[in-house]
């Protein structure tokens, strides 16, 4: 992961949003020294901005820094991209608190996905060229203006897809697809519980459920988001703040559900398991219950660990149920597997069956606000970061 290390190590530590020093005297012939200084400044390379995680803790641990731009020099099998949009994921929030095990050593540029334009192609790359619009799935390092990545981790963006939609697609939709279809074996007539149904993965999962006939979707979210959930395809929105989702589901479906998508962990995994019908599956793909505030909460860690679900093979056999675990970060070497899923997702997009729902778009300068938007669960859909100017949300 040399790209991330180079970005972090070369960062100047200066906020790129600060105005440059004024040089009014540079045009004054009576001040030759000032003129020479201005000329030297003009000849210096431009700066590229990046976000750097400098330590574990609150929102202030992610700093906007800059590094001198250099001519792109991708190695064999690599591409250099100019990024236009980057995805923010729950794993990035956990990484900031030191809770994500796939993060390279600090300081590091976070970010697992983005979309942009190819500006240079390395030796041996024949299926990409300068000017191509691509989206990228990477272990980290995507929150910067330019990045060099392996070509096999990039995917061509469909003509009708925007950069923002492309930056919102990969992590959320790959996760939702593989949980529902590869693990869950979603079939017509099935019922699915989608936790955090207004989040990026949740919205993606609900759209994918709509591609299968007669699927009933139970979706948990705060009451203010229920209208958006219904518009996206949730059959039965449930306000987890005021009701017990287990009781609500049992009222409608006494036998339970076929698939539980569990990003929560802790005691909620056990609840999901007990909601399963015979031949049902709970697929756990996150530990959102660990995050209770901007900084790491040791009590939440202890509580979630203590309540971690455990089941024996004999119990699974007797119940005719399955428990599965999914972690996209550990599939970074499974190029063919992931590429096949992306191909199916792009086909669904081109057919009009799925479309990433963008909650908000934030400039790099407001990364703290973007993280807060997601961590406080105010978002409906995907939260994005962009190197360019702020957009109205």
From Swiss-Prot:
<keyword id="KW-0496">Mitochondrion</keyword>
<dbReference type="InterPro" id="IPR002364">
    <property type="entry name" value="Quin_OxRdtase/zeta-crystal_CS"/>
</dbReference>
<dbReference type="GO" id="GO:0005576">
    <property type="term" value="C:extracellular region"/>
</dbReference>
<keyword id="KW-0472">Membrane</keyword>
<dbReference type="InterPro" id="IPR020843">
    <property type="entry name" value="PKS_ER"/>
</dbReference>
<dbReference type="Pfam" id="PF13602">
    <property type="entry name" value="ADH_zinc_N_2"/>
</dbReference>
<keyword id="KW-0560">Oxidoreductase</keyword>
<dbReference type="GO" id="GO:0016020">
    <property type="term" value="C:membrane"/>
</dbReference>
<dbReference type="InterPro" id="IPR011032">
    <property type="entry name" value="GroES-like_sf"/>
</dbReference>
<protein>
    <recommendedName>
        <fullName>Synaptic vesicle membrane protein VAT-1 homolog</fullName>
        <ecNumber>1.-.-.-</ecNumber>
    </recommendedName>
</protein>
<feature type="modified residue" description="Phosphoserine">
    <location>
        <position position="2"/>
    </location>
</feature>
<dbReference type="GO" id="GO:0035578">
    <property type="term" value="C:azurophil granule lumen"/>
</dbReference>
<dbReference type="GO" id="GO:0016491">
    <property type="term" value="F:oxidoreductase activity"/>
</dbReference>
<dbReference type="Pfam" id="PF08240">
    <property type="entry name" value="ADH_N"/>
</dbReference>
<dbReference type="GO" id="GO:0010637">
    <property type="term" value="P:negative regulation of mitochondrial fusion"/>
</dbReference>
<keyword id="KW-0597">Phosphoprotein</keyword>
<dbReference type="GO" id="GO:0008270">
    <property type="term" value="F:zinc ion binding"/>
</dbReference>
<comment type="similarity">
    <text>Belongs to the zinc-containing alcohol dehydrogenase family. Quinone oxidoreductase subfamily.</text>
</comment>
<dbReference type="InterPro" id="IPR036291">
    <property type="entry name" value="NAD(P)-bd_dom_sf"/>
</dbReference>
<feature type="modified residue" description="N-acetylserine">
    <location>
        <position position="2"/>
    </location>
</feature>
<feature type="modified residue" description="Phosphoserine">
    <location>
        <position position="44"/>
    </location>
</feature>
<feature type="region of interest" description="Disordered">
    <location>
        <begin position="1"/>
        <end position="40"/>
    </location>
</feature>
<feature type="modified residue" description="Phosphoserine">
    <location>
        <position position="35"/>
    </location>
</feature>
<dbReference type="InterPro" id="IPR052100">
    <property type="entry name" value="SV-ATPase_mito-regulator"/>
</dbReference>
<dbReference type="GO" id="GO:0005741">
    <property type="term" value="C:mitochondrial outer membrane"/>
</dbReference>
<feature type="modified residue" description="Phosphoserine">
    <location>
        <position position="18"/>
    </location>
</feature>
<comment type="function">
    <text>Possesses ATPase activity. Plays a part in calcium-regulated keratinocyte activation in epidermal repair mechanisms. Has no effect on cell proliferation. Negatively regulates mitochondrial fusion in cooperation with mitofusin proteins (MFN1-2).</text>
</comment>
<dbReference type="GO" id="GO:0070062">
    <property type="term" value="C:extracellular exosome"/>
</dbReference>
<keyword id="KW-0963">Cytoplasm</keyword>
<keyword id="KW-0007">Acetylation</keyword>
<keyword id="KW-1000">Mitochondrion outer membrane</keyword>
<dbReference type="InterPro" id="IPR013154">
    <property type="entry name" value="ADH-like_N"/>
</dbReference>
<feature type="modified residue" description="Phosphoserine">
    <location>
        <position position="27"/>
    </location>
</feature>
């Amino acid at each position: 992961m040399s790209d991330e290390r180079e970005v972090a190590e070369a960062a100047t530590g200066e906020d790129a949003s600060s105005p440059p020093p004024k040089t009014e005297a540079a045009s004054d012939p009576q001040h030759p020294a000032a003129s020479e200084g201005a000329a030297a400044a003009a000849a210096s390379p431009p700066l590229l901005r990046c976000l750097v995680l400098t330590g574990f803790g609150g929102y202030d641990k992610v700093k906007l820094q800059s590094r001198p731009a250099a001519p792109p020099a991708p190695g064999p099998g690599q591409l250099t991209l100019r990024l236009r949009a980057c995805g923010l994921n729950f794993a990035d929030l956990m990484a900031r608190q030191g809770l994500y095990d796939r993060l390279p050593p600090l300081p590091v540029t976070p970010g697992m996905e983005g979309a942009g334009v190819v500006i240079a192609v390395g030796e041996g790359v024949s299926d990409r060229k300068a000017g191509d619009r691509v989206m990228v799935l990477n272990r980290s390092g995507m929150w910067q203006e330019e990045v060099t990545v392996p070509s096999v981790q990039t995917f061509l963006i469909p003509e009708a897809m925007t950069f923002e939609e492309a930056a919102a697609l990969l992590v959320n939709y790959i996760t939702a697809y593989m949980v529902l279809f590869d693990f869950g074996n979603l079939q017509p007539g099935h019922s699915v519980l989608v936790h955090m149904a207004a989040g990026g993965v949740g919205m993606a999962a609900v759209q994918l459920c709509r591609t299968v006939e007669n699927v009933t979707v139970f979706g948990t979210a705060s009451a203010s988001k229920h209208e958006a959930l219904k518009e996206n395809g949730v059959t039965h929105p449930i306000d987890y703040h005021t009701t017990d989702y287990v009781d609500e589901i049992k009222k409608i479906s006494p036998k339970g559900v076929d698939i539980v998508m569990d990003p929560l962990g802790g005691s909620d995994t056990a609840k999901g398991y007990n909601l399963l019908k015979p031949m049902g599956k709970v697929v756990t793909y996150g530990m959102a219950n660990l995050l209770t505030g901007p900084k790491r909460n040791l009590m939440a860690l202890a509580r979630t660990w203590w309540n971690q679900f455990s089941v024996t093979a004999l119990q699974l056999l007797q119940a005719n149920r399955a428990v599965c675990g999914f972690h996209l970060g550990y599939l970074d070497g499974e190029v063919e597997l992931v590429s096949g899923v992306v191909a199916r997702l792009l086909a669904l997009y081109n057919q009009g069956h799925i479309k990433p729902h963008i909650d908000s778009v934030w400039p790099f300068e407001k990364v703290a606000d973007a993280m807060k938007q997601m961590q406080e669960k105010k978002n409906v859909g995907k939260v994005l970061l962009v190197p360019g100017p702020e957009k109205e949300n």
